[in-house]
Structure formats: structure tokens, C-alpha cells
């Protein structure tokens, strides 16, 4: 079982990672090409393109400028510990056991606008480049065109490496669009999380993101390897709703 998640906008480079182990990202030759394009942008360009404040635009212009093709523990941090945000709150990587972290390294992949696909312990320099950014590049007008089949090929390689054909999509639509489902050598499962509010069950972004992270944690801690085990997910009050589920899209609900 291979699991895909989105990255996060919020980063933490102040606190040390929970492990000194690290690996190096595989697709940095592509990252370098994107950094070259990003360095052409002024802070005002970045503010407009990314719809961020002048302060955040300035910070990211500086990040693009200082980005180096050489990754060290001085300029980078393991991705799963660097990302902060709702998904990563749910995952709580800081408290993973050694066994669960080891499973994460083979079973969890993080989609990224700049790095393509990251293993949890891949060193990552700070950046902000969301997959939906319309950044003109040598291959087109956006990052989906830039990455083409590259990310899908890496997903297939990771699926093959970890030994089965089940791909659990816990990423957002924006990020999963970088994967080409028809080219995936496996079965794609996309869990849906619904919370009850005002008498109705609906997908509430904040809760759904956190639930995705909790499901990753559940998979790692419980050595989940098939759909039957996945559907037993019951963290934080969620329960499997068979009536609304399909094989490709299991639905999990939670009361108010």
C-alpha cells in the first residue's frame, strides 16, 4: 500500500527533526529548472502569481535566491518534519515509532510543486510553490505541464518497490491532478471524510485534511495492507459508512 499526501504551506525550520536520519530527494534536476524560473520573478511578481502578501512574497523571493542544489542538514530538513499544517497535525510525525517511521519511508509519498515527489525523510529546503501555480516554464504555462508524466512514473516506481498495487490517495485535488490515473500501475483508493454539521454530513476542509493525516498515522501504526483493514479506520470518532462507500471511494463519517 502506497499513500499520497499533499504538502503544507506552513513550514517549521526552527525546531529540530525527531531523527537525524535523512535521504536525498530524487528529482532535484527538475527542481533546479523551476528555481531558475522562479528567480526571474520579482517579489511583486510572486505576490501576484501566488496571491500572497508582500511580506510572504519577499520571504519566498529570498528562498528562491538562496536555494542550493547541495542539500545538507544545515540548509534543509526532512520533509515530514518540515511541513506543518492540518494533514501533518493529524499525522503527528514527531511521535512516530521507529517502526512506523520506517514504514512511512517505504509507504508514504508527499506530492510537491517544487520537488515532485518526496519520501518522508528526504531533505527539503524551504519553499512555497503550490502545484496549481501558473508558472510559465520551458514545458508550458503551469506545473502540471512541467511535471508531465514524471511524478506518475515515480509513483509507479514506489508502488513496485513496496510490493503491491494499492494506491491510497489522501492528497487534495490540486495535488493529485499531477498524477495521471490512467498511467498508474495499480488500484487507486480515494477516502472521503464527512462531518455532521447542522444535521447534514459534508466534507469540511479543515477536518478532512486532519483526518487524512490521521489515516496515514493509522495505516503506519497498524501495518494496514489492504482495503478491509483500511475501512476499520476509527480515529477521532470517524467510522466507515458502507452504504455510501464504493470500492474506489470509502466514506468515513463523524457526528457533531
Swiss-Prot record:
**What is the protein name for this chain?**
UPF0246 protein Swoo_1284
Q: Which family does it belong to?
A: Belongs to the UPF0246 family.
GO cellular component labels = cytosol
Classification lineage: Bacteria, Pseudomonadati, Pseudomonadota, Gammaproteobacteria, Alteromonadales
The record's annotation in HAMAP family points to: UPF0246
Q: Which organism is it from?
A: Shewanella woodyi (strain ATCC 51908 / MS32)
Instruction: Identify the Pfam families for this entry.
Output: H2O2_YaaD
Superkingdom per UniProt: Bacteria
> What NCBIfam families does the record tag this protein with?
PRK02101.1-1 (NF002541), PRK02101.1-3 (NF002542)
BP term (GO), one: response to hydroperoxide
Amino acid at each position: 500500500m502506497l499513500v499520497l499526501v499533499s504538502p503544507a504551506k506552513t513550514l517549521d525550520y526552527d525546531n529540530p527533526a525527531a531523527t537525524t536520519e535523512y535521504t536525498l530527494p530524487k528529482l532535484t534536476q527538475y527542481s533546479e529548472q523551476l528555481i531558475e524560473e522562479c528567480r526571474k520573478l520579482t517579489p511583486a511578481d510572486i505576490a501576484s502569481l501566488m496571491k500572497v502578501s508582500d511580506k510572504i512574497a519577499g520571504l519566498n523571493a529570498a528562498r528562491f535566491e538562496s536555494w542550493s542544489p547541495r542539500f545538507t542538514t544545515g540548509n534543509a530538513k526532512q520533509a515530514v518534519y518540515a511541513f506543518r499544517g492540518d494533514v501533518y497535525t493529524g499525522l503527528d510525525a514527531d511521535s512516530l515509532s521507529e517502526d512506523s517511521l520506517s514504514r512511512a519511508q517505504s509507504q508514504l509519498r508527499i506530492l510537491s510543486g517544487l520537488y515532485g515527489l518526496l519520501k518522508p525523510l528526504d531533505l527539503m529546503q524551504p519553499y512555497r510553490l503550490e502545484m496549481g501555480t501558473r508558472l510559465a516554464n520551458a514545458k508550458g504555462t503551469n506545473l502540471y505541464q512541467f511535471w508531465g508524466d514524471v511524478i506518475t512514473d515515480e509513483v509507479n516506481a514506489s508502488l513496485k518497490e513496496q510490493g503491491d498495487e494499492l494506491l491510497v490517495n489522501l492528497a487534495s485535488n490540486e495535488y493529485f491532478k499531477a498524477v495521471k490515473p490512467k498511467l498508474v500501475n495499480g488500484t487507486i483508493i480515494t477516502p472521503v471524510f464527512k462531518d455532521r454539521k447542522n444535521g447534514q454530513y459534508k466534507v469540511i476542509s479543515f477536518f478532512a485534511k486532519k483526518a487524512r493525516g490521521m489515516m496515514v498515522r493509522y495505516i503506519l501504526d497498524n501495518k494496514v495492507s489492504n482495503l478491509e483493514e483500511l475501512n476499520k479506520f476509527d480515529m477521532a470518532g470517524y467510522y466507515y459508512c458502507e452504504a455510501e462507500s464504493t470500492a474506489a471511494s470509502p466514506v468515513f463519517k463523524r457526528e457533531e
